[in-house]
Swiss-Prot record:
Subcellular locations according to the entry: Plastid, Chloroplast thylakoid membrane
Membrane topology: Single-pass membrane protein
GO MF: electron transporter, transferring electrons within cytochrome b6/f complex of photosystem II activity
Protein name stated in the entry: Cytochrome b6-f complex subunit 6
Length: 31
């Protein structure tokens, strides 16, 4: 079970961090 929980947590973190990085890159490109 811990492995599934950690995997789900990693997936959730990736789904929240990826959009933030894309937004940062788009802002840098606009500037």
């Amino acid at each position: 079970m811990p492995t599934i929980t950690s995997y789900f947590g990693f997936l959730l973190a990736a789904s929240t961090i990826t959009p933030a990085l894309l937004m940062g890159l788009s802002k840098i490109r606009l500037i």
